[in-house]
């Protein structure tokens, strides 16, 4: 990645960073419970090094980020208020929260910043221009963001989870200000470059999640490159159904059955499916679990996890791997009775890593599972903060938020 980094900005001999406005696009899109409490602060923690370095250097730091998918306007449910409190705690310094995105409160607070201050703008997606398909509308929002940091300001892209989006605070802003990759984005891209260019073999890929359609492009791409591709999670049932197996009430995408059959016909020696399944009569944390063979799922039950024999087989595949990429849980890990498959496969990846494998957890639910199941995060070589961005990179797609940094 031929881009300028945070180090270049901090060590620019021509322009002192102290006193300058710096807009940082962070990824602070953390999960909240029904009471609005943060359940996994991983992305907030990952954003700290860049913000800390800038504040320590005396920059006037303005952070922009989103939370959830508000529908085109302010919604208290998606306010960054709990994020600002958590960020203050993790950063060890007060983080102001603006009452709007680029309105009068944001402007007044930006003008009042002193060296080393940190201001978090309210949810950028409260402004519909952020996600507009209209280039002109997005540019107008980007221009309003420039006004907050000033003409001598800079932009630091540090939200890896959004670099696959062509949005005002990710893409358009970088066309208007001197731009740099933050610590997190630079590290993420370096890892993915390593994963795509110099892969040590055997190369094992573990894919989970609920829908085949969400992962189709990455399955097609990685099946050509990997030595083994393990499929679990809800999407394994569409693959099983494509082989004429009855999967009961399990999640199936009927429109993807032919595609799954073709994938198995083409890459049958690479793709590995579960051989046993943990089923239950309903999707519930206290549903009674039962382990059955993958081709013996009762009509009145649904699969909610892979079984112990599948974990054993997948562990054997992973034990000799030199490179591992994992994206997506093996089952409904949020329910303790259906978490063993995800935990078992994760432990197998940790075991391979301990023997020298290079392992990458591709963000999203997999990263949440690692933390929720109490697994050692340092047991993996890298845990990404961006699920969708990681997948699109591995598919070979151009990521707009990275592409623009290279210009």
UniProtKB/Swiss-Prot annotation:
GO terms for biological process: gluconeogenesis; glycolytic process. Keywords: ATP-binding, Cytoplasm, Glycolysis, Kinase, Nucleotide-binding, Transferase. It catalyses: (2R)-3-phosphoglycerate + ATP = (2R)-3-phospho-glyceroyl phosphate + ADP. It comes from the Bacteria. Its main location: cytoplasm. Pathway: Carbohydrate degradation; glycolysis; pyruvate from D-glyceraldehyde 3-phosphate: step 2/5. ATP binds at residues 215, 303, 334, 363-366. GO terms for cellular component: cytosol. Substrate binds at residues 27-29, 43, 66-69, 125, 165. Its EC number is 2.7.2.3. InterPro entries: Phosphoglycerate_kinase (IPR001576), Phosphoglycerate_kinase_CS (IPR015911), Phosphoglycerate_kinase_N (IPR015824), Phosphoglycerate_kinase_sf (IPR036043). It is found in: Cytoplasm. GO terms for molecular function: ADP binding; ATP binding; phosphoglycerate kinase activity. Monomer. Belongs to the phosphoglycerate kinase family. This is Phosphoglycerate kinase. It comes from Mycobacterium sp. (strain KMS).
């Amino acid at each position: 990645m031929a881009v300028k980094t945070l180090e270049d900005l901090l060590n620019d001999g021509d322009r002192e960073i102290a006193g300058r406005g710096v807009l940082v696009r962070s990824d602070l899109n953390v999960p909240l419970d029904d009471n609005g409490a943060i359940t996994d602060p991983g992305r907030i923690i990952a954003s700290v090094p860049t913000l800390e370095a800038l504040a320590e250097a005396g920059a006037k730091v303005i952070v922009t980020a989103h939370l959830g998918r508000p529908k085109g306007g302010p919604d208290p449910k998606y306010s960054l208020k709990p994020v600002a409190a958590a960020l203050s705690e993790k950063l060890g310094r007060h983080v102001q929260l603006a009452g709007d995105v680029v309105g009068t409160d944001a402007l007044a607070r930006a003008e009042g910043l002193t060296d080393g201050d940190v201001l978090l703008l309210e949810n950028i997606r409260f402004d519909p221009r952020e996600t507009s398909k209209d280039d002109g509308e997005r540019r107008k929002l980007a221009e309003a963001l420039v006004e907050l940091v000033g003409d001598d300001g800079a932009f630091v892209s540090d939200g890896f989870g959004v670099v696959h989006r062509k949005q005002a605070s990710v893409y358009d802003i970088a066309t208007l200000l001197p731009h740099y990759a933050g610590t997190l984005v630079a590290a993420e891209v370096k890892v993915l470059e390593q994963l795509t260019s110099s892969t040590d073999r055997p190369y094992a890929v573990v894919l989970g999640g609920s829908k085949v359609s969400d992962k189709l492009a990455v399955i097609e791409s990685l099946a050509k490159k990997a030595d083994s591709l393990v499929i679990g999670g809800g999407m394994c049932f569409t693959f099983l159904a494509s082989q004429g197996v009855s999967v009961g009430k399990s999640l199936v995408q009927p429109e993807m059955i032919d595609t799954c059959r073709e994938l198995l016909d083409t890459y049958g020696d690479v793709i590995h499916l579960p051989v046993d399944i943990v089923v239950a009569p309903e999707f519930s944390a206290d549903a009674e679990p039962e382990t059955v063979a993958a081709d013996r799922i009762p009509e009145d039950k649904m699969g909610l996890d892979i079984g112990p024999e599948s974990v054993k087989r997948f562990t054997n595949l992973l034990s000799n791997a030199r490179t591992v990429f994992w994206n997506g849980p093996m089952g409904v890990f949020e329910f303790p009775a259906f978490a063993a498959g995800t935990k078992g496969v994760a432990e197998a990846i940790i075991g391979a890593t301990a023997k020298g494998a290079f392992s990458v957890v591709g963000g999203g639910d997999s990263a949440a599972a690692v933390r929720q199941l109490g697994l050692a995060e340092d047991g993996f070589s890298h845990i990404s903060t961006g699920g969708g961005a990681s997948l699109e990179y591995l598919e070979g797609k151009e990521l707009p938020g990275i592409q623009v940094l290279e210009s």
